[in-house]
Amino acid sequence: MTDTMSKAVIAIERPARWAKQLGSHLGHKIAVAEVENGWSFTIDGAYGEALATGENELTLTATGDTDELRQRMEFVLQKHLLKFAADHNPEVVWH
């Protein structure tokens, strides 16, 4: 079994704020840790990060033991970001 990884780079103002909001909210549901420039998230078999990678750039990453687990992490991060930042209408495209 190999890890699969994807990444989404989102243009959004105050990316550190959105990373922190994801960390604060998801910390009640899954394992969350503060990392350099953002937050990491762990669900059984999947790992993700929300990082402020530029002045107006938030990078989300998702890794999973399987494609299904990676997609689960993508879904969780994307769903919550789109909910929190709805007024900013961020475009999330995973690669």
Q: How should these model regions be labeled?
A:
Residues 15-27:
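Amphipathic alpha-helical segments
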Residues 35, 53-54:
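Structural motif
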Residues 6, 36-39, 91-95:
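Structural preference for solvent-exposed beta-strand-turn elements
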Residues 4, 51-52, 79:
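Charged, terminal alpha-helix-loop-beta segments
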Residues 1-18:
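Terminal, regulation- and interaction-focused segments at domain boundaries
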Residues 57, 61-95:
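C-terminal structural segments of small proteins and small subunits
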Residues 28-48:
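Ser/Thr-rich, low-complexity intrinsically disordered terminal regions
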